[in-house]
Every structure is written in C-alpha cells, then in structure tokens.
Amino acid sequence: MLGDGNEGISTIPGFNQIQFEGFCRFIDQGLTEELYKFPKIEDTDQEIEFQLFVETYQLVEPLIKERDAVYESLTYSSELYVSAGLIWKNSRDMQEQTIFIGNIPLMNSLGTSIVNGIYRIVINQILQSPGIYYRSELDHNGISVYTGTIISDWGGRSELEIDRKARIWARVSRKQKISILVLSSAMGLNLREILENVCYPEIFLSFLNDKERKKIGSKENSILEFYQQFACVGGDPVFSESLCKELQKKFFQQRCELGRIGRRNMNRKLNLDIPQNNTFLLPRDILAAADHLIGLKFGMGALDDMNHLKNKRIRSVADLLQDQFGLALVRLENVVRGTICGAIRHKLIPTPQNLVTSPPLTTTYESFFGLHPLSQVLDRTNPLTQIVHGRKLSYLGPGGLTGRTASFRIRDIHPSHYGRICPIDTSEGINVGLIGSLSIHARIGHWGSLESPFYEISERSTGVRMLYLSPGSDEYYMVAAGNSLALNRDIQEEQVVPARYRQEFLTIAWEQVHLRSIFPFQYFSIGASLIPFIEHNDANRALMSSNMQRQAVPLSRSEKCIVGTGLERQAALDSGALAIAEREGRIVYTNTDKILLAGNGDILSIPLVIYQRSNKNTCMHQKLRVPRGKCIKKGQILADGAATVGGELALGKNVLVAYMPWEGYNSEDAVLISERLVYEDIYTSFHIRKYEIHTHVTSQGPEKVTNEIPHLEAHLLRNLDKKGIVMLGSWVETGDILVGKLTPQVVKESSYAPEDRLLRAILGIQVSTSKETCLKLPIGGRGRVIDVRWIQKRGGSSYNPETIRVYISQKREIKVGDKVAGRHGNKGIISKILPRQDMPYLQDGRSVDMVFNPLGVPSRMNVGQIFECSLGLAGSLLDRHYRIAPFDERYEQEASRKLVFSELYEASKQTANPWVFEPEYPGKSRIFDGRTGNPFEQPVIIGKPYILKLIHQVDDKIHGRSSGHYALVTQQPLRGRAKQGGQRVGEMEVWALEGFGVAHILQEMLTYKSDHIRARQEVLGTTIIGGTIPNPEDAPESFRLLVRELRSLALELNHFLVSEKNFQINRKEA
C-alpha cells in the first residue's frame, strides 16, 4: 500500500506509461541482474579465467533515427558494451577490454519497438502467481478431498493431498504419488526432524508402518524410492551420484524454484520467516504446507480462490526482456567456453574481444520480437488502436492458458478486477475473457500485482490522501462507489452510500466508509471510457463498441464528436499522432513536411508525417494548426494527426440520422444513406497500399530492372521511367507494370527461334534469354503512386537482395457493402445509397443522411444511442459540445433524460423551431417522405449521433473466381480471397437449391465447378466453341477419395453409373 505525494489531486496517468516504465525497469535493473549472474569461465586446465565487470556496462545511442529505421527496414537498437577481463592464473596477469556483446532493441516513448522496420509491441501476460494454493474437490463417493498445489516460478506443479485416513501424499507427476515422509526424507530431513517441525506429529506417526520406516531409514533409500516413483523406473535402481544429479536437475531445480514472488507468497500463506533471497522450496515449506492441509481437513483455515487477482501476477515487458537477456547470456557463455578450449587446443593467445561474439544476443532478441506470441505487430488502424494495443492483458502465451481449454470461470469477471481490469473491454470469439484491457488508473506494482488508486477518508484530517492498493489489500476496507467528481463534494456527504466490502456490494452509512473511488472512469479501459451514456447500454453492446472504435478508419475530413466523455484529448495526446512543441518559441517557417521553431538562441526542426502508410493500409498524415510567426508555449499542439481535430480524437462524423423503417432497405441491421455522404466526401478515406519486389543474383546472373520488356504492350509500360520503375504521381490501373524486371534463364538449343540460331552460327552472337518477372498491379489496386523506395542491399551479399517498394494511394468513398457503426454497438452494412431528394426530410427542409432500423434498439438494450442522438441534435443547433461522465444517475434520478430534454427545449427556443422539442412526443419529430412530400404516420426520433466508418470495406472483401488453384487431395478449389479460392457450397446451401428443384445447377456445383477433373477441363473447351456442356461420365474426385478411405478400413465399396439412354448399368471401379 503506497501513498501519493499529491494531496487530493488526481490526474490521469499517461496511457503508454506501463509499457515505457517496464522497459526502463529492464534497462535499470534487469540488465545488471542478469549480467551479475554471468559466471566466471575457466578452461579445462584451469589456467585462464574469463569474467565480466558489470559495473562499467554502457548502452550507446543509436546511429540512426526512428524514421530511417522504418524506411530502410532496420532495427532501432542500442549497442551494449561491457568490460571483460582474461586472467592468467599462473602469472596473475590480467587483460581487460571493453567488448561489444550485441544489440538491444530500444523502445520509443509510445511503448513500441522497431524491429526490421516494423513497429512491434510486447503485451503483458497474466499468470498464476507462484506459491501454494488449497482447494477442495468431491471424489466418486461424494467426500471432500483437500489438495494443496505448489506452483513453481516457471509454472511446474506439484500437489499435496490428504485422503480419508488423514494420510498425506505428494503427487510429483500425474500418475505416481509418494508419502510426504519419503519426500521430506529425500530433501534431507530424518524422522526426528520431521516430527519436531510439524504441528500434528501424531497424524504423521499414524501412517508410519514398517514399510515406510524402511523407505525413510536412510537418505539413500528415500532418494531411491523418490527417484523410482518420480521417473517411473522399474526394477531396483542403485544409488549413485549421477542419479542424484538427475533428480536435482529434473525435479528440484525445475519444480522447486519459487522465485522472489513465490517465496513472498509462501511466507505469507504459511506464516514462515524464510529469507527472501532463498527462492527454492525447502523441507520447512513442505511440512508447513502439510500442517495447513491437515488444518483444512479438520475445518480450520479457508480455501483459495484461484481466479482472484491476488493469486495472479503480471509478466510485464521488463520480465520478458530480462528472460530473453538471460537466455542470450547462457548462449554466450557456451560460445566463450568453446572458444577458450579451442584457443588453448590450437595454442593461440585469446583476448576478450576474440572470445565474445554479438550474434547470440542480437539473434535472441530478433527471434523473440519476431516469433514470441506476446510480441505482436502494432495495430495502427487509428490513434486509439495504438494506445489500446499496448494496454492489453493476455492469459494466453507460454506458461499461460489456451483458448480451447480455458474454462468459463477463468473467463468470467471477478470482483477483484474492480478498478484494475476493465469488465467491458475484451475480445470476441474464442479468446473472450482471456484477453482483457487495463483500467485507466491501474498500474503494475513491485511484486507483479495490479494496483488501483483510492482516496482515504480520515476523520482526523480534512484533506484526502491517495493510496494505491494491491488486489488483496482493498478487501479489508469499506470502499464507497462515489468518486471525487461528485457535484456535492463540498457539501455534507449522503447519509447512505453504496460500498464494496470483501467482494460483496453493500449499502452502508457514510461514517463507516474507509476509501472511495477517485474517478468515474476508474473501472473502465480507454475504449469503454470513450462511450457516452455507457450506463444505459447492455454490457455486450458496450464490448462491441469498444472493439469497433479500434476499427474506425481515419477520414479525409475529420470532425470532433458533439457528445463525448472528456477523454478524447488525453487519448489523442498519448497516441503520438499529434506534433507537440517540446519547448516555447516562435514559428519562423512552415511547410507541409516540417516546422522550424526558434527559441533559446537556436532553431529546432520538427518533421511532420506526410502520407505515411500504417500496417492496416490506412493513411497517417499530419496537418498544420499554427501559422508562421506565432509564439507558442511548451506542450502546445502544432499539427493534428490522422483522426484528430484540435488535439482531440475524431474517429467519425456527426450525421443526421432517423430511426425508421424505409421500404425494407434497413432490415436486419442494414443502413440506408444519402448520396450527400458520397458527393461531399463526408465518409471518404485514403488508403495506402505497399507493393514490393526483390532483385536476386541467380545462378545465371543478376536480375535486371529495366523499362525494355519484350512481348508486353506499350500502354502497360507507359508509367515507367528510364530505370524501369514507375514514376511518382502516375495514375495506375489494374495490370499496369510498376517495376520492369527480367530474370535470366537457361534455354535449350531447340527452343531458340531459327533466326537466333543463324546469328549464333554465323556471327557467334550470344542471344540473351530472359523471363519477364515484372511487378504488376493486382486487381483492385488502382490509384496514385505517392512514393517509390529503392533499398540497396547491405554488405554486397546475394542473400540480402535489393528491394523496390511502390506505395499507391487510393481514395475510397463510402459505398454499398461498407460497414458503419455508432459508439453503442449499433453496427450495420450500407444497403442502398438514395438520391438526397428521395431521403426523408425534416420540417426545416434538411434531408436525413442515414436511416437506421428502430428494431435494433429495444432487443439489444443499447439505449445510450438514443440519448446521444437527441443530445447531438441539440448540440448542433446550439453550436455546443458536451463532455459527459458516465453514471450520472448517482447525482440525480433520471439525470441523463433531464439533461437531454432540457437541451432540446433550449435549442427549440433559441432556433424558434418548435418541432425540435414537442412535449407530446419529446425527442421525436414529424418528418416527410422525400418521394411524395407527405408526412409519415408516426413521429420519428431524429438526431446527430457520431457514426464511424470501419475498416471492413467491400473493396477488400469482394471476390470472384473463374478458375484457380485446387487442393491436391480432394481436388476442390482452395478457400479464401488470398488464395484465389472458390465459394463454398455447404450442406445448407445444397438444401436450399434442392428446395427449388434446380437439378442442373446442383450438378454443376458438385461436379464441373468443384472436383470433377475431366469434366471441368471439357467445360472450358465447350464454353469457348459455344457447344453444350457434356454430362460427367465418372465419379467426382471427393467420392473417389471417400472410397479409398473406406478401403483403408477394409470396406470395399463399388459404384455404378446408369446410362440415360437405355438405362444400362455400367460397373465402374473407383
């Protein structure tokens, strides 16, 4: 429990702080901890000793900038140098040198690393904390069986269990179990010491028979018995040093290492006073655990809740990077040991620099960032996505759970998550509940626990003090659900308040309260905190909304939301999308790609991001906000980024929406939109695609980039420059050549044309033969070339080919098939784009922009969208923006409804439009059909909610196939757009076709278009010549496959074909 220095003041912490603090902890502590573990290495004759001097290690500032690392596909890393010494023991001479160990990838201020030019992020993992946990299960007779599970630092498990006769067994593997006496004896205790160190010696003596006495008669006997049971070895093994070493390595080192956290948990649970630096399981731990187990058997003590956060620990970035650094040092140790022995054998004089190589550390980190499940490519769809990604918590990964085996209990919300893990924000699908998100104020404590802040309420002092509590600590306090933003903070608090105590929610008197929450958003993640009126939504819809905001595409003309929560500015600030002044000064020069800031006697150049591609193909672009000559302060916003306006997050647009059915075009969550959204570029976004090609050195010679490509039409090469690369600013269409490339190949003599053979015979001219391997623009890739990058190979190696990248920008208007969504889980697909004169219009003549289905509201219980819709209309008429904290009902009953109606009433008065607020049906209005001009029968809810355009766009999903690849075994078309796959006709589709009696279409689906090899070849020919498609004469390949599989089970299956003409049966073998 820690206090904070700021009395009574609470600020939202930086959203990237957890990642950045973790990396700093690794650099400050983790590096030195692992370097101190590096042993002194001696040669076999013990004449030379190699050691590291950790005190003088240094990290060098990178030679390249972040932008250059991304541009050239390099790793943004720092070189690690350590002093090392070689000591000759005979002469006591020492040679000391500063050696280069390897590169460590650095983290930027946004919490991301750049590895091979790609932004990557390491997410935090939740693991079961090492220690001992007690639980109870019913056996087949319905009797409770108590067990204690000891979890080691790396996740290995051993169990203690007590049976009906109060005998205690240790289970070190799934099948075998041994007596607790044998285990204690194998760990070094004799019978007298065992009985002296337990609270219930009579129970231990009760199952001590002659056979047991013989097993524990000596340490050797107990070790042999333990080895026999643990390793499942038959016969009579003989005691030896190698057997002891094997047991030490396989059991005691792997399953008994508790670690620093495990030792602390064990001491707390069993009331032990073993020193913290003793991180291995001791006999005292085993006996104390057995005593506790006996106490549980007789009704003393409490069982453990495995899902409580006090029994979990966070494996942060620091822990993961430190583990990898330790692994790299072990590999380095093996390299140094081998090199010393080789040098002595060949009678060479080694030096510290010759002994140490950098690949072990560099390759370890590259493989970690590239292959580890917790190292992920940073999702950069929009600014919100970037900061949310770094705050994820995962139960998956090495040592964790798997999506298919995790139970419902683990996935469920637990009371200890309050203020630490968001109860809303999790992934959908198989990983639901296994990937969560940190609450806004949560932080990772010293022992790997999640801590949440509270205000302490003290009778002695009028001020308040902020405390950070770990999950187990806050259960002993009465925690009021009220927060410091209450309207009546300075007035006497309410007499009765809702509170939380020992995982229960109670209503108690204010005098009994110990702590209170500090912020309305304290329980939620960033995504959930951006949903206005979230308290009026069903939690499932809020979950969908927090996920869909991360999928919003940055629009070409962003717009601030009228109704927000107040966190939009902080989210934009911490995302890194904005350009912020690092110091005060005056703007002396601006253009599209940089700002020059004068101050303190020098000029600072601030580069801007111009049309940069994200890994989701969205466009990252910064726009100036300050004019030349303006004086600015430190921290002021100089340029807006993608999806930000005025330094606030702006993911969508405020559009005029009506909730009403319209000719069935908005049934089943479909959305009807006006053509105004297309023509006025309201939902237009830019997408940048990357196309690349490599040039290799083949066995026949190097590949050549050129604009002289034979056998290709001239109009396909029209955009190439002299070098054979597409020119900047060119407009390219599908099939155009982006990079002209020729690959040399060997051609047989007979393949040459007659004139080529004549030239070779008479003049001896070698006719070059090469294959055209150009980079062509694929289907759907039309657009404008905005950047071309030619990255030269480093070091001249043929294994590092030259790479040419072409970036093409596409302008995409909203169209039928695109997905749009609100901030309340109300999502839909565009079904029709109506002319604006046909759309319903309001009483002031404005036509509606979107028509949503009203049936999507009551059953889904996301009523927050109605509040936002009406308040947005009032805000647009009054030219106001609202920032509303969640759970405003605590201040006044029906507070949200009263606020919305009062604003609508004010808007009605100020604009002199009585239709804005009509007391008979408040919030609704009579609107007119654009086609006929007649009013609709019922009044309709109209408003201005904030609607997002999502990245699920029809241009990326629409797909057709005429012919393509087939699977080798079944001979059926492959699956998926990326493989040019076919459309699957499943069981239900076949039933639907059968229901309409379309026999010929069914036959085509099951034969020609699928896996009938000969028939599908004949179809192509008959289609070209215009003939009739012949009927297939044999069985399709999938049927033949079924027959073969049945034969493998010794079942013979023959099939027959019946002739259509004379109904003769022809027997055919499969």
Curated annotation (Swiss-Prot):
Catalytic EC class: transferase
GO BP, sorted A to Z: DNA-templated transcription
EC number annotated for this UniProt entry: 2.7.7.6
Segments traversing the membrane: none
Superkingdom in the source lineage: Eukaryota
GO cellular component terms, A-Z: chloroplast; DNA-directed RNA polymerase complex; mitochondrion
Reaction(s) this enzyme catalyzes, per UniProt: RNA(n) + a ribonucleoside 5'-triphosphate = RNA(n+1) + diphosphate
GO molecular function, one term: ribonucleoside binding
Pfam families, per the entry: RNA_pol_Rpb2_2, RNA_pol_Rpb2_3, RNA_pol_Rpb2_6, RNA_pol_Rpb2_7
Intracellular or extracellular location(s): Plastid, Chloroplast
Keywords: Chloroplast, DNA-directed RNA polymerase, Nucleotidyltransferase, Plastid, Transcription, Transferase
Function: DNA-dependent RNA polymerase catalyzes the transcription of DNA into RNA using the four ribonucleoside triphosphates as substrates.
Family label: Belongs to the RNA polymerase beta chain family.
Assembly notes: In plastids the minimal PEP RNA polymerase catalytic core is composed of four subunits: alpha, beta, beta', and beta''. When a (nuclear-encoded) sigma factor is associated with the core the holoenzyme is formed, which can initiate transcription.
Protein name (Swiss-Prot/TrEMBL): DNA-directed RNA polymerase subunit beta
Organism: Solanum bulbocastanum
